[in-house]
Amino acid sequence: LAMAMGDAVADAQARAMAAAYAIAGKEKEKLKQCFKDMTLAAIDYAKHKVEKHLFKCI
């Protein structure tokens, strides 16, 4: 059951991505840049959290 649920989620994600790309069309580059920016922001945020935690420990 858990595997079936996982497959359903993966399928839904794949369909959502396909739809997003189909809608985006020529916007694909902008979409890629957006994902890149979000990833970098997430990394910066995680680093900041880790550093803050480190300073608390010291």
From Swiss-Prot:
Biotechnology: Neurotoxin that could be considered for development as an insecticide, since ingestion at high doses is toxic to both Drosophila (D.melanogaster) and blowflies (L.caesar). It is not toxic by ingestion for bees, aphids and weevils (S.orizae).
One GO CC term, this protein: extracellular region
Additional free-text comment from the UniProt record: Negative results: does not show effect on the activity of Kv1.1/KCNA1, Kv1.3/KCNA3, Kv1.4/KCNA4, Kv1.5/KCNA5, Shaker IR, Kv4.2/KCND2, Kv7.1/KCNQ1, Kv10.1/KCNH1, Kv11.1/KCNH2, C.elegans KQT-1 potassium channel, and sodium channels DmNav and BgNav.
Record's protein name: U11-myrmicitoxin-Tb1a
Methyltransferase is among the record's keywords: no
Disulfide bonds: C34-C57
Statement: the UniProt record of this protein carries the keyword Cytoplasm: no
Similarity section: Belongs to the formicidae venom precursor-01 superfamily.
Tissue expression from the record: Expressed by the venom gland.
